[in-house]
Amino acid sequence: MSRRGNIKRRPVPPDPVYNSRLISMTIRRVMKSGKKSVAAGIMYDALTSIGEKTGSDPLEVFEKAIKNLTPLVEVKARRVGGATYQVPMEVRSSRGTTLALRWLVHYARIRGGRTMSSKLANEIMDAANETGGAMKKRDETHRMAEANKAFAHYRY
């Protein structure tokens, strides 16, 4: 790892359709092999589908889903005298959003269904309703942190 100081974080430009940074970040997560236009098509199809199914603004549903999926705490491995402890740590907002998007896209991919856009739309709607695979992952992360609360004093 380089010791030359911190890298400057580049801001994510908002997407052209919804003017949302969150959607732009999701498109980048959905993208495979540099095919951004395909990923954008999948994301916009999913949002259109959400709008039709729920009858409400798809951007609001999506933002609610991400808010529900964002973890507050996570566990990190810390080695102390030959033993490895799972130490609960608070999650920074940027990392929380990144984890939420990662889980959302991962559980959409492994979900049953015909197209990626329909799977993504269903996973987003489930997350907005606090159900689905990604929501289970968030709850599991919180449970792990709660179970290992005794090791919180090893925080670094």
Swiss-Prot record:
Top-level taxon in the UniProt lineage: Bacteria
Pfam families on file: Ribosomal_S7
One CC-aspect GO term: small ribosomal subunit
A single MF term (Gene Ontology): rRNA binding
Record's keyword annotation contains Transmembrane helix: no
GO terms for biological process, alphabetical: translation
Alphabetical keyword list: Ribonucleoprotein, Ribosomal protein, RNA-binding, rRNA-binding, tRNA-binding
CDD domains: uS7_Chloroplast
Signal sequence interval, chain numbering: none
UniProt KW tRNA-binding keyword: yes
Family listed: Belongs to the universal ribosomal protein uS7 family.
Database matches in NCBIfam families: rpsG_bact (TIGR01029)
Subunit structure: Part of the 30S ribosomal subunit. Contacts proteins S9 and S11.
Function noted in UniProt: One of the primary rRNA binding proteins, it binds directly to 16S rRNA where it nucleates assembly of the head domain of the 30S subunit. Is located at the subunit interface close to the decoding center, probably blocks exit of the E-site tRNA.
Protein name per UniProt: Small ribosomal subunit protein uS7
Species for this entry: Rippkaea orientalis (strain PCC 8801 / RF-1) (Cyanothece sp. (strain PCC 8801))
Gene name of the record: rpsG
